[in-house]
Swiss-Prot record:
Transmembrane domains' residue ranges: 29-49, 72-92, 236-256, 272-292
Pfam families named among the record's database cross-references: Bestrophin
Lineage: Eukaryota, Metazoa, Ecdysozoa, Nematoda, Chromadorea
Function: Forms chloride channels.
Family label: Belongs to the anion channel-forming bestrophin (TC 1.A.46) family. Calcium-sensitive chloride channel subfamily.
Location(s), subcellular: Cell membrane
Keywords for this protein: Cell membrane, Chloride, Chloride channel, Ion channel, Ion transport, Membrane, Transmembrane, Transmembrane helix, Transport
Gene: best-13
The name this protein goes by in its record: Bestrophin homolog 13
Main location: membrane
Description of how the protein assembles with itself and partners: Forms oligomers.
Keyword Secreted: no
Amino acid sequence: MTISYSGNVIRILLRWKGSIWRTAWKELLIYLILYYSVRVFYLKGIDLIDDDEDDRLKMRRMFETFCRQCDSYTRLIPLTFLLGFYVSNVVARWWRQFETLYWPEDILSVLCTVLHQHDEKSKRRRHTIARYLNLANALAWRDISSKIRLRFPSVHSLIESGLLTEKEYQILEAMHAENESSRWITPLHWIQLIMRQVEEEHKPTASLFNQFVGELRIFRQSLRKLYSYDWVCVPLVYTQVAALATYSFFFFTLFGRQPLFPDIETGKELDLVVPVFTIVQFLFFVGWFKVGQDLMRPFGLDDDDIELNYILDRNVRISFAIVNQLQESPIPDFESNDDKLWHEMHPPTKDGETSPIPRIPQLPHSKYSKQLSEHPPRLHAYVPIDDGKGSIKDLESHHGCVSLKKDKKHISW
């Protein structure tokens, strides 16, 4: 599931699961090994290549020139622009896929209004429709989510979960043999057939029935959009450009960020054994790029991937609670004398009747929320003006929000 976090900055930075440390530590380790390999070559390796002092000095100067060129090359790569545009598109795409997920409360609430009878057949119909909705989700999500696929490795495994019966499984397999794309659509079509029977038997209100059909269409569209997101990924060339820019930038820093003897001797540079700024920069940019890589497939196995297993379990519980428990439970007695707000809004008069003008009740505060209510929000979009007598009056109470005298200083909006 996407990692939830709260607290101060120190606690957030020390988190491991779903953090930048877990994402980029392997790349950082490889980078530091290569960096210190180049450093050892510059400090000790050149002296071991040739015994001639002049040749070693010439080779060292050539290496220093190459390092300076690499440092200048890093300024030519617009890494911030490329990564910013790339990651912003990937994160927006990731969030749109989460928003595409359909929650069953809306369609089942309409169902309980259309099919509100309490006979056994109506109960079974509501229960079956709720099961078919979750079955369609499970069939579609197992095609796009690695976690759902691991939970239900085959369609037959849905029988053990209770979402599918053996007879329905045979129908689904027969349909799948003829058309591979019809498996997840079939339960939604069964819902339409059930509602057609309900329409013929109970004659529900046309507006409510049309609303249910509209919610079912939105449900179908959400699954189709998820398939589309899974089929059509971010263009490969876009990812390649971002990857090439990121890793080539830090390849050049392997040489360009080396402390050189001439700069150290003249005091232009300090010989920091640990390249602190380069490490921080590496974590920034590589972690930034890894965010785009990890969020490319939001239904995978990474820490920040959307947990469809939890959502499926939650939808199953909510669905059957709506069509069974909530629909069959009696309505609370609202005509009793337990409604405190009703008595506050309609206090009895002297003749025993309720007041014709209701009062607006004030909800009480606890001792913890009392201090928060002492500073209510207020409007600041008004212009005070001088009425010529030395007093300040509000613009709205005297002139409205449209006109002011031309000889007055005012703010127009």
